[in-house]
Amino acid sequence: MGCPCELRIYAGQKHQAQLAAKACMDEATRFEQKYSRYLDSSAATEINRSAGIKPVEIDAETYAILKYAGVCYEQSNGLFDISSGVLRHVWHAQRSDLPSEDEILRHLNLVGWEKIELSDQNIFLPISGMELDFGGIVKEYAADAIAALARTMSIRHGLVNLGGDISIIGPQVNNRPWPIGIVHPTIADTAISVIHLANGALATSGGYERYVEIAGKRYSHLINPQTGWPVESLLS
């Protein structure tokens, strides 16, 4: 998934823990193979490759993820938009100068969840060059799915951490909640806060590890889909 992943599980027997761990890791691999934009065979690549050409048939799982992406888009007033991944072509690590407003505008014309044609059978990106980036939503979905899978295998204590997207399987063995540290965005090896969770989930992101540096200034990988510029007011 292009990020460190962690699985912590506790079981009464070693064999039970090994079986559950393998099942959980296999499920994580399945999600990556299905939704990674870096794999030619993935559903995400097929959707993007067909932009402006034809609708792509989708299964129930993909439809559920896309419907949830739509909910996030509405609840965030358009700030969470999985069609904004195309802006990574503007803000990439090889840049040595700031992009022009024309370059940003050309890419912004390819952004917009409201442009997408979606049904429970297929999806169509109507403009050639449009792209969906599932990375901002699939990790959360996958973490919840993996935690649920572990519980079906009688795992009652543990957590799933997919690059900062955390889903709790159950509390620690002593029934205490898990302490989840929120990394300080500017001070190395420091937590800005600690949240204790015995159930539920938590998703975090920040620009302290993934960023573009231009003329000595760091620009976050978190990009405002309405302006085309990296966010500055929210570091973590």
Name every feature range the model reports, one short phrase each.
Residues 1-236:
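Mature catalytic core of soluble alpha/beta enzymes
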